[in-house]
């Protein structure tokens, strides 16, 4: 597979190739600019950003059921995610937290939170937390992930557990003015 990548690079020019390394089982390491690599550290600003990125990953893995359990003990927030998505092969369970590793070579998505599928979300989570790992997973069996972070390392949004409050905007439509959006 790496020979194929080398051949394509020699024919099309190194700059046109999106794949740096084929990791097998549908996973690749993408090329990325230094600016994107440095931005990864700033992609995760709050605990809620972790939840959003993990939900996006579950969605992209085909999960239609995702469960989240959370605790906070001695200043450490622990999140456990369970999903019924496509799963992570055993030999990729540590590598998916490396920069630019993705199974989404042809399916990068743009949604309200930005671009997803560059292989940077799990890397960003790992860079900004004390622990991020696959607890268990199997191909077509779903996955369980655990993420732990000290409250003084990554904050939680102040309104994360407040009740939503709807108010009318200038056009008379109800919008969420307070609480989770």
Regions found by a protein language model. Give the residues of each.
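Glycine-rich G1-box
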Residues: 86-87
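Acidic ATP/Mg2+-coordinating residue in the GHKL
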Residues: 83
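Conserved ATP-binding N-box helix of the HATPase_c
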Residues: 41-73, 125-126
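Short beta-strand element(s) in the Bergerat
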Residues: 75-79, 143
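N-terminal assembly/transducer modules of large multi-domain enzymes
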Residues: 155-181
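Bergerat-fold GHKL ATPase/HATPase_c domain
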Residues: 1-53, 175-181
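Hydrophobic/aromatic residues in the conserved F-box-adjacent beta-strands of the Bergerat ATP-binding
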Residues: 68, 79-80
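Flexible ATP-lid and adjacent glycine-rich G1/G2 motifs of the Bergerat
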Residues: 90-146
């Amino acid at each position: 597979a790496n020979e194929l990548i080398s051949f394509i690079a020699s024919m099309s020019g190194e700059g046109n190739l999106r794949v740096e390394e084929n990791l097998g089982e549908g996973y690749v390491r993408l090329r990325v600019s230094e600016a994107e690599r440095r931005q990864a550290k700033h992609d995760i600003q709050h605990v809620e950003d972790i939840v959003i990125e993990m939900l996006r990953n579950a969605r992209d893995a085909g999960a239609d059921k995702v469960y989240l359990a959370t605790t906070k003990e001695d200043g450490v927030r622990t999140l456990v995610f369970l999903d019924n998505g496509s799963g992570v092969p055993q030999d990729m369970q540590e590598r998916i937290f490396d920069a630019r590793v993705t199974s989404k070579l042809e399916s990068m998505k743009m949604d309200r939170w930005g671009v997803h599928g560059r292989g940077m979300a799990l890397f960003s989570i790992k860079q900004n937390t004390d622990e991020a790992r696959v607890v268990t997973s199997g191909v077509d069996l779903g996955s369980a992930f655990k993420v732990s972070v000290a409250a003084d390392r990554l904050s939680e949004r102040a309104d994360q557990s407040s009740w939503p409050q709807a108010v009318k905007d200038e056009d008379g439509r109800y919008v969420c003015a307070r609480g989770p959006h």
